[in-house]
Structure formats: C-alpha cells, structure tokens
Amino acid sequence: GTENILGAIGFGKAAEVVIQNSGENTKVKNLRDLFETKLSQHFPRVNILSQNVSRLGNTSAIVMPGVLAETQVMGFDLDGICLSAGAACSSGKVKRSHVVEAMNIGDEPATNTIRVSFGWDSTEPEIDFLIDTWLKIYERANKKI
C-alpha cells in the first residue's frame, strides 16, 4: 500500500516537541506531587490512589470520603475548575469507575474518585485554589443539618 508520508512527518514533529518539552514533564510531575502533599497536609484522611507507584506525572486520582464523584465534579465546576470522574476513556459518563473497581479496593473509591490533570501551564496558586475548593466541597457535603 501507499506509505503514509504525512503521518510519518507528523509523528516525527510530535517526537521533536516531546523532546524539546521534556523539562515541562518534570515541572508538571512536581506540581502534581505538591498538590498531593498539600492536600494530605490539609486533609490527612484523603486517599490518593496509586500514590506510591509509577504513574502518569500529570494526573491524580483522589477519593473524597463520603462524597459521590458526580457531586464533586459539579461543585468544582461551579467554582470554574474542570476535572473529571471515572476513567479518561469514559469521560462524560456518570457511572462507577471501572478502573478503580478493577483495583479491588472497595466500593467507596469506585464511586467517590475524581481525576485531576495538570498541564504545562498549571501554577501553584491554581493548586492552592483547587485545595481550598476541595475542602469547601467536602465541608459542605458533610455539614450536619
């Protein structure tokens, strides 16, 4: 068949960009780690999934005890923060995370996990705002009426 020359050129350019920006990946991982450290300091009960294993440098999966993922996503959205629940391959669907279910760590993580992704332009003040919002959502959801 015909060789995909344009595809090969595009792939080569993409590889160049990845190499040129490899330092950005370290920066993003450091921001993710800073977020997880600060969140753990403010809320020791937080469950950060797969925190101590090799994983994507830009993503955190966090269980908010007692608060459904859908409730969290709506709360963050109201404050202008975009994040998601469930696996990346099922974005936009409101259902239990099949990825977290496969980890076999219980029902609450499968229903209460949010996924936070950081990018090259993410900043420490944005992380602080995210943590403040996280705590506000948790407190509001657990407020005794």
Write out the residue ranges for each language-model feature.
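Pyridoxal 5′-phosphate
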Residues: 1-145
